[in-house]
From Swiss-Prot:
Belongs to the class-I aminoacyl-tRNA synthetase family. ValS type 1 subfamily. It comes from the Bacteria. The keyword NAD does not apply. It is found in: Cytoplasm. ValRS has two distinct active sites: one for aminoacylation and one for editing. The misactivated threonine is translocated from the active site to the editing site. Transmembrane segments: none annotated. Catalyzes the attachment of valine to tRNA(Val). As ValRS can inadvertently accommodate and process structurally similar amino acids such as threonine, to avoid such errors, it has a 'posttransfer' editing activity that hydrolyzes mischarged Thr-tRNA(Val) in a tRNA-dependent manner. Pfam families: Anticodon_1, tRNA-synt_1, Val_tRNA-synt_C. GO terms for cellular component: cytosol. Gene3D superfamilies: HUPs (3.40.50.620), Isoleucyl-tRNA Synthetase, Domain 1 (1.10.730.10), Valyl-tRNA synthetase, C-terminal domain (1.10.287.380), Valyl/Leucyl/Isoleucyl-tRNA synthetase, editing domain (3.90.740.10). This is Valine--tRNA ligase.
């Protein structure tokens, strides 16, 4: 085996070999249980980020673990067309390269351009997924706009429409005036902002007066430009100031519209003036108030966010109405919305109706892609009636057919599902699944899978003109069908029969509603088992936290704190990293700050760590459902782990290859250490499997690390040396056999988390064991064997370890050279301790570097010594001739003084109010941690001073 572990040499060739051999495919054995995971489809033209790497590592660990248990295992892979994101990338590209817009191209040519871009860049993410070691079945790869999935989408739309579960209606949506499309709540970013609250007088009509004799109401608003669309003023029905005015009217400033005063809980007596203007066409809360009180809806904005030349007036059903005039004062027509705000405030002020302006902190919704303020907009959109679909989806979680891990996410799911609104599924984009609806000149709407089908079903001749709806479906609509459409639905395929319902869905909690809930609703509506019972899409939902940077900040390009997972695998120089983080920025003014931070964090760039080290780190950080702060030190630690495993394996191979390891018969004697490591290994297998079965990847990683590093490498390999240098034939055979057997089992155990290094080493180890199989991937996963757990061997070895550690600690504390042989005396020994010393003298002499071991008679106190107490005995190391008392005390005094200086420095820092107020919490916590460490070190040194003074 190569002397040093170099992941760059082994990982890619190995993956290509696995893929070529077809090891990722299901085994097709229907007598075995199936296990299936659907990958959350990443954006087809995107690239892999830490969230992907994190979730995919968890999925691959589960898939490899189940595959090794002989299950018929499928990890379904695919990518998402990502409507708005992909369209924007291509729009930006043609603007930059050709100075054109999509309208210059026209719809068909622009869509061709996107398909072209997909062909060019669509391979990036799948290449990166291969680099992670993902054992997905590439032959089944799907794309949300491939032919099969497009047919499934049409099928679902048509069926839901025919069941009256899809309708077209005029409702309020999040409108992005820059992109000119409706967007989902997930694409809205709420930003804190310092704004104003304008207090405007609305004159009361018909001589009405308030309780304190005023002939107007004062209405407070943060959006005076929407005054033109008001159709009511709400007051709280319990408010003594205004309750007598409910049912009366005010005259709306600037347009002189007579609008009613309504009593509604939405008006808060404590907030503002207690009077709230109601603009149902431009505010989500007002829309609901308007529906409750049958207030008309007046839309005053164009799709670009400008004031219209004349308003659109609708009743609460969204039908055109002439209950109010559609006139808009000429001076506001065509004004951009924020210019209109200024003009309207000035006009209200000129009329003497502006009472006051107060500074006000508010939350403003921005489109996360377009970057402009989102406008609630009344538009014609297609909707899914969600309440009907939600009922069975809630029951499936209530009765345990679907379980959330961690369980607390069920509450989040229930709170959304029990208050579900109809789902707006149309988007004003070009890239996506075009809505299968056609309009006749007579205003009729026809829905069908194709135009031909529509004409046939409705007896429409070739002379009848039809035009297809321009809109496309929300990307989440096709993703909601992901678990069954990828398996070949609407055909009744073998894949559906074998792999649906799927086993586990791994997802971030941020899309629990947008994706998880909708998958449950859609699947249960369309997929039934042979008894007609609705099928769930998956049995378990495993929720991950979000990966943040080392300071707990969300990773984003604008913050310049994104770490590309493959840069940790392959390494990246500082100049390349800076270019990556500061090139093509939306906000170039941030570049300098980002450059400084990056130079401080990665002065030499990022070193290569290999995929296995990255995967191990991600698994170790996967604590349930909490956000995770990325830690480069952990990554280094797990790279060191891979090196340690490599070096330990070389030691095993050097001592066993071409040697008699007892696999072909011959007498074998197992030493205490052999029996102990077999017991430890089996206990590890049991705990590790339990952790994986309970989705505790962090605990599993910890168990693997602890056994490999501490028990196998640090203790067992050392404990084999006395046998290797002086054992009998049968002892040598026993120890070699144990070395190889435990290493081979350990490689299988670790394989799901660190696949590359384990396969590479296993290919060498299998030869010694006489295994002829081709790959570790399809080997049986280790099982717990209680017969190998020798309790006596565990107890005796723990005692030996205690004794060896005690001697090593005395060496370290007394500053005695590690190589200097020592004399060990034991005082006050129990019978058990005497037996253990006599049985294991060679281990003790060897590992504790002793020249002699003497058990003192009961009445012998022994010479002046440094002592340690262990189970059933006191260990003494005589100090005569080992140390110079004066020199040692002087050295310790120097050490204490140095530490006291550090303690004073940190205490000074922490008592500085300025530092504590300014420094991030993480920095303060680190300083406190250092302080505790120094205090502990000082206490130990003082203890040593006392011991040496007494000599």
């Amino acid at each position: 085996m190569e002397k040093t572990y170099n992941p760059q040499d082994i990982e890619q060739p190995l993956y290509e070999h696995w893929e070529k051999q077809g090891y990722f495919k299901p085994n097709g054995d229907e007598s075995k249980e199936s296990f299936c995971i659907m990958i959350p489809p990443p954006n087809v033209t995107g690239s892999l980020h830490m969230g992907h790497a994190f979730q995919q590592t968890i999925m691959d660990t589960m898939i490899r673990y189940q595959r090794m248990q002989g299950k018929n295992t499928l990890w379904q892979v695919g990518t998402d067309h990502a409507g708005i994101a992909t369209q924007m990338v291509v729009e930006r590209k043609i603007a930059a390269e050709e100075g054109k817009t999509r309208h210059d191209y026209g719809r068909d040519a622009f869509i061709d351009k996107i398909w072209q871009w997909k062909a060019e860049s669509g391979g990036t993410i799948t290449r990166q997924m291969r680099r992670l070691g993902n054992s997905v079945d590439w032959e089944r790869e799907r794309f949300t706009m491939d032919e099969g999935l497009s047919n499934a989408v049409k099928e679902v739309f048509v069926r839901l429409y025919k069941e009256d579960l899809i309708y077209r209606g005029k409702r309020l949506v999040n409108w992005d005036p820059k992109l000119r499309t409706a967007i989902s709540d997930l694409e809205v970013e709420n930003r804190e902002s310092k704004g104003s609250m304008w207090h405007i007088r609305y004159p009361l009509a018909d001589g009405a007066k308030t309780a304190d004799g005023k002939d107007y109401l004062v209405v407070a608003t943060t959006r005076p430009e929407t005054v033109l669309g008001d159709t009511g003023v709400a007051v709280n029905p319990e408010d003594p100031r205004y309750k007598d005015l409910i049912g009366k009217f005010v005259i709306l400033p600037l347009v002189n519209r007579r609008i009613p005063i309504v009593g509604d809980e939405h008006a808060d007596m404590e907030k503002g003036t207690g009077c709230v203007k109601i603009t149902p066409a431009h505010d989500f809360n007002d829309y609901e108030v308007g529906k409750r009180h049958a207030l008309p809806m007046i839309n005053i904005l164009t799709f670009d966010g400008d004031i219209r030349e004349s308003a659109e007036v609708f009743d609460t059903k969204g039908e055109e109405s002439n209950v109010y005039s559609s006139e808009i004062p000429a001076e506001f027509q065509k004004l951009e919305r924020f210019a209109a705000r200024k003009a309207i405030v000035a006009a209200v002020d000129a009329l003497g109706l502006l009472e006051e302006i107060k500074p006000h902190d508010l939350t403003v919704p921005y489109g996360d892609r377009g970057g402009v303020v989102i406008e609630p907009m009344l538009t014609d959109q297609w909707y899914v009636r969600a309440d009907v679909l939600a009922k069975p989806a809630v029951e499936a979680v209530e009765n345990g057919d679907i379980q959330f891990v961690p369980k607390q996410y069920e509450n989040m799911y229930f709170s959304w599902m029990r208050d579900i609104q109809d789902w707006c599924i149309s988007r004003q984009l070009w890239w996506g699944h075009r809505i299968p609806a056609w309009y006749g000149n007579d205003g009729n709407v026809y829905v069908g899978r194709t135009e031909d089908e529509v004409r046939q079903e409705n007896n429409l001749g070739a002379d009848v003109q039809l035009r297809q709806d321009e809109d496309v479906l929300d990307t989440w609509f096709s993703s909601a069908l992901w678990t069954f459409s990828t398996l070949g639905w609407p055909e009744n395929t073998d894949a559906l029969r074998q792999f649906h319902p799927t086993s586990v869905m791994v997802s971030g909690f941020d899309i629990i509603f947008f994706w998880i809930a909708r998958m449950i609703m859609m699947t249960m509506h369309f997929i039934k088992d042979e008894n007609g019972k609705p099928q769930v899409p998956f049995h378990t939902v495993y929720m991950t936290g979000l990966i943040r940077d080392d300071e707990g900040q969300k990773m984003s390009k604008s913050k310049g704190n994104v770490i590309d997972p493959l840069d940790m695998v392959d390494g990246i120089s500082l100049p390349e990293l800076l270019e990556k983080r500061t090139g093509n920025m939306m906000q170039p003014q941030m570049a300098e700050k980002i450059r400084k931070r990056t130079e401080k964090q990665f002065p030499n760039g990022i070193e290569p760590h290999g995929t296995d080290a990255l995967r191990f780190t991600l698994a170790a950080l996967a604590s349930t459902g909490r956000d995770i702060n990325w830690d480069m030190k952990r990554l280094e630690g797990y790279r060191n782990f891979c090196n340690k495993l490599w070096n330990a394996s070389r030691f095993v191979l050097m001592n066993t290859e071409e040697q008699d390891c007892g696999f072909n018969g011959g007498e074998m004697t197992l030493s205490l250490a052999d029996r102990w490591i077999l017991a430890e290994f089996n206990q590890t297998v049991k705990a590790y499997r339990e952790a994986l079965d309970n989705f505790r990847f962090d605990i599993a990683a910890g168990i693997l690390y602890e056994f490999t590093w501490n028990q196998f490498c640090d203790w067992y390999l050392e404990l084999t040396k006395p046998v290797m240098t002086g054992g009998s034939e049968s002892e040598l055979r026993g120890t070699r056999h144990t070395l190889v057997t435990v290493l081979e089992g350990l490689l299988r155990l670790a394989h799901p988390i660190i696949p590359f290094i384990t396969e590479t080493i296993w290919q060498r180890v299998k030869v010694i064991c006489g295994i002829t199989a081709d790959t570790i991937m399809l080997q049986p996963f280790p099982e717990y064997n209680a017969a190998q757990v020798d309790e006596a061997a565990l107890a005796d070895t723990e005692w030996l370890k205690q004794a060896i550690v005690a001697v090593r600690n005395i060496r370290a504390e007394m500053n005695i050279a590690p190589g200097k042989p020592l004399e060990l005396l034991l005082r006050g020994c129990s019978e058990e301790a005497v037996r253990r010393v006599n049985d294991n003298r060679s281990f003790l002499l060897n590992l504790a570097r002793l020249e002699s071991i003497t058990v003192l008679p009961a009445d012998d106190k022994g010479p002046v010594s440094v002592t340690k107490i262990i189970d059933g005995a006191e260990l003494l190391i005589p100090m005569a001739g080992l140390i110079n008392k004066e020199d040692e005390l002087a050295r310790l005094a120097k050490e204490v003084a140095k530490i006291e200086g550090e303690i004073a420095r940190i205490e000074g820092k922490l008592s500085n109010e300025g530092f504590v107020a300014r420094a991030p919490e993480a920095v303060i916590a680190k300083e406190r941690e250092k302080l505790d460490g120094y205090a502990e070190a000082k206490a130990k040194l003082i203890e040593q001073q006392a011991v040496i003074s007494a000599l």
